[in-house]
């Protein structure tokens, strides 16, 4: 009997700092599963990479007085060496600065836009008068309007895991200088996520491989009503938004890093002289995609990533399993690279 191919993925860690043990947990779990399926005789590919874009990197680079590229080039090399010391059996550990990744992501989103799932909208967003910049994602902090956590960021609350609108933060402040932001109007490109509500509900409900925490969180998210998600940011660090009129905008990190599971597969087979074979892992219906993540990444892997794949109309395999670990606490607090809490893997 022919055994189906298995693609094992682990969440791409931000590398503004060395990783802590909490970051390593899903990677270790993925490594165990990759080794298991290899022993069972399956063709297995295990991919991941360093997420070098996004505001976590930008904020840390500002604090250190270096460029995001300088910071991430150094940390990527360090992380690769650490994974070798931990004997993680990656087939391809790459980076979101990979030319293959950039090309794939831009072509992918052009397709999504051509299919009618992208629109523009003017929004009021926080702007720091001292730093003279808009404050996307981790450039702005405040109190979570849902759970009251004081250190919530502009895109997500670390404490309760909710995706946030930065305009809803209570007592918002610039994470660089601490100033209270002004709110200025700017145009962004949005993904029409609500159009996938029914398909996502059916997919999540019927997928018996999902652990209860991932299924329950995701179904609650859908029940509360999916909202269009902004795809672009006012930033020059990241992948340029490939939409007409979007000059000077980059893609929000969660609209490009999850696509790295596909681009890393493409990159692996390109470098091994078989450039079309990646399709066997992403389109053959006897192949399975397994994602290993931390619980704060659930909505990006069970909602946004599947919706993006559906939006291409190309028949991508959706994740067969999204395995999630709970947060690893250290001295009573959630491990966090940005807050320098945890046990470091070096």
Residue ranges and their predicted role:
Residues 73, 121-122, 138, 168-171, ...:
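Non-catalytic, surface-exposed connector residues within folded enzymatic/regulatory domains
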Residues 84, 114-117, 162, 179, ...:
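Generic secondary-structure signature for well-ordered alpha-helical cores
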């Amino acid at each position: 009997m022919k055994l189906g191919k298995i693609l094992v993925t682990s969440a791409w860690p931000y590398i503004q700092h060395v990783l802590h043990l909490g970051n390593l947990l899903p990677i270790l779990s993925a490594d165990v599963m990759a080794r298991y399926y290899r022993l069972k005789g399956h063709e297995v590919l295990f991919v991941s990479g360093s997420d070098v874009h996004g505001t976590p990197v930008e904020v840390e680079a500002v604090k250190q007085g270096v460029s995001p590229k300088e910071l991430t080039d150094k940390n990527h090399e360090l992380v690769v060496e650490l994974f070798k010391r931990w004997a993680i059996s990656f087939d391809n550990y790459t980076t979101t600065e990979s030319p293959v990744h950039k090309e794939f992501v831009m072509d992918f989103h052009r397709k999504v836009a051509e299919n009618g799932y992208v629109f523009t909208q003017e929004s009021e967003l926080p702007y720091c008068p001292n730093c003279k910049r808009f404050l996307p994602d981790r450039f702005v902090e405040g109190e979570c309007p849902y759970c009251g956590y004081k250190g919530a960021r502009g895109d997500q609350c670390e404490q309760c895991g909710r995706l946030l609108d930065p305009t809803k933060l209570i007592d918002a402040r610039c994470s660089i200088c601490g100033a209270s932001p002004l709110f200025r109007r700017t145009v962004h490109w949005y993904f029409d996520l609500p159009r996938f509500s029914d398909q996502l509900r059916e997919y999540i409900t019927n997928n018996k491989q999902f652990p209860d925490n991932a299924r329950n969180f995701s179904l609650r998210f859908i029940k509360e009503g999916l909202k269009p998600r902004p795809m672009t940011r006012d930033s020059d660090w990241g992948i340029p938004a490939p939409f007409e009129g979007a000059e000077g905008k980059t893609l929000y990190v969660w609209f490009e890093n999850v696509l790295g599971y596909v681009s890393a597969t493409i990159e692996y087979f390109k470098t091994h002289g078989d450039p079309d074979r990646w399709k066997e892992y992403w389109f053959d219906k006897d192949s399975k995609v397994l994602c290993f993540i931390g619980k704060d990444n659930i909505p990006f892997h069970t909602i946004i990533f599947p919706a993006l794949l559906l939006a291409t109309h190309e028949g991508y395999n959706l994740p067969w399993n999204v395995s999630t670990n709970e947060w690893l606490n250290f001295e009573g607090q959630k491990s966090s690279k940005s807050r320098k809490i945890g046990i470091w893997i070096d």
